[in-house]
Amino acid sequence: MKSPAPSRPQKMALIPACIFLCFAALSVQAEETSVTPQPPDILLGPLFNDVQNAKLFPDQKTFADAVPNSDPLMILADYRMQQNQSGFDLRHFVNVNFTLPKEGEKYVPPEGQSLREHIDGLWPVLTRSTENTEKWDSLLPLPEPYVVPGGRFREVYYWDSYFTMLGLAESGHWDKVADMVANFAHEIDTYGHIPNGNRSYYLSRSQPPFFALMVELLAQHEGDAALKQYLPQMQKEYAYWMDGVENLQAGQQEKRVVKLQDGTLLNRYWDDRDTPRPESWVEDIATAKSNPNRPATEIYRDLRSAAASGWDFSSRWMDNPQQLNTLRTTSIVPVDLNSLMFKMEKILARASKAAGDNAMANQYETLANARQKGIEKYLWNDQQGWYADYDLKSHKVRNQLTAAALFPLYVNAAAKDRASKMATATKTHLLQPGGLNTTSVKSGQQWDAPNGWAPLQWVATEGLQNYGQNEVAMDISWHFLTNVQHTYDREKKLVEKYDVSTTGTGGGGGEYPLQDGFGWTNGVTLKMLDLICPKEQPCDNVPATRPLSESTTQPVKQKEAEPTP
């Protein structure tokens, strides 16, 4: 006797399953064809631990980036022979056996530059090339030049780069945009995903998935050819984020995938390792030791996963905002990540259609629609009136409002009535004289009050504009630009983060001194300058008085989600 034909809901469930099984093979194939470079804590074992614990360098990243002058196994053998000998000098041993990273030259801009001129002049200063690296270097080679954030950093970072690329495009450097997309595609083909940054010690995690948005940006210049060219890499990245989904039962999690009790599929941040981060070794060990009630490996994994989120660190991940050792990133389903996954699915549908595969496009649309329903069901706090993260331990949406709540608006996944409530919540709780607060909590962590970060300012601005909430959107842009301009007027630089409780002050907190440069601030500043000033009268500095522009009255016409029932 024939089995009954599957019902419509069963058919809908079969479509994503097919996609996940097909793409799991892509992820495995990418991993099998590459030899993963070992991070320095594995290559050097006890020597790495001893050097970092000795605090030979003010910044723990210094030794993580040091290049062994010979085979690490030989260096380690020499160390074991010499370390207990009388008069052994660890610093001298390191200086003899390693090439330490050079301090970046401090950039002194020409006098009298406008804000726009300063940013345009920085692009070549921040550009690096690493087609070839030393054999045991933690730096991973990339085929094309790339733009680093600036300051402390010698490598390219994943999610930073999207906002940097917005500025490159605004400056007309489409060649650099294309180079950076090609580099990230190379990483996907080589490692199966885009690591946090191009360092061996970042390979165990990724960052907020903006690659599909980068390809979409490039398509503004190159048309559908860009979408078709990078469709395979977008599919591989999607496979990475959904790896393990085909074996999940309801209520289970596997790496970056979460399957809730009703079968809803969402994602979380995850790092494959559960050891201290090489670039913050001593700090991570101290954090783990400060909470003996939790396994150290669990704390290490959650610290690493918070780094994967880009929000390292924030009260958003903690039970107690004043105690970093209470963070539990892996038991939280983030609203921003799932918004980006929704956007990835939508762009994959568009790219599949451009490539002539309508059946595959429909499957991605099905996945996007299912995720959108999941966002509305699990990542909306109806009592508070804003989007928020979901807690896997309490099985409830969290109460905290953060700037991540604007991501559903940014990717056009929000219901129209909820977007209106988000505008009210943003203006009431997050908008400050110097821009948008990251959260309203003062924890001393850098992704909390009073700090404001350029990418979140842009996500909020564009997200609110997508739903016609132009007044609040323009308030955010104007407040943040004023902050950037005041800081530039005083210090002649753009910085990584800003204190938004006032104007003209760089932000605090974090694991390293405030950085200048700064890639994503440069990009967002250029976008906002063009937003507040009329096209016929572009401004090179932030005007002394707020101009009226078409943007303040005309909403950006985007497709909106239907109101929630």
From Swiss-Prot:
A GO MF term: alpha,alpha-trehalase activity
Region (Disordered): 539-565
InterPro entries in UniProt: 6-hairpin_glycosidase_sf, 6hp_glycosidase-like_sf, Glyco_hydro_37, Glyco_hydro_37_CS, Trehalase_periplasmic
Transmembrane segments: none
Entry annotated with the keyword Signal: yes
Signal peptide stretch: 1-30
PROSITE patterns given in the database record: TREHALASE_1, TREHALASE_2
Residues binding substrate: 152, 159-160, 196, 205-207, 277-279, 310, 511
EC number: 3.2.1.28
Active site annotation, chain numbering: 312 (proton donor/acceptor), 496 (proton donor/acceptor)
The keyword Hydrolase appears for this protein: yes
Record keywords, A-Z: Glycosidase, Hydrolase, Periplasm, Signal
Single GO BP term: cellular hyperosmotic response
Cellular-component GO terms for this entry: periplasmic space
Annotated localization: Periplasm
Reaction catalysis annotation: alpha,alpha-trehalose + H2O = alpha-D-glucose + beta-D-glucose
Subunit structure: Monomer.
Family recorded in the similarity comment: Belongs to the glycosyl hydrolase 37 family.
Chain's role: Provides the cells with the ability to utilize trehalose at high osmolarity by splitting it into glucose molecules that can subsequently be taken up by the phosphotransferase-mediated uptake system.
Name under which the protein is recorded: Periplasmic trehalase
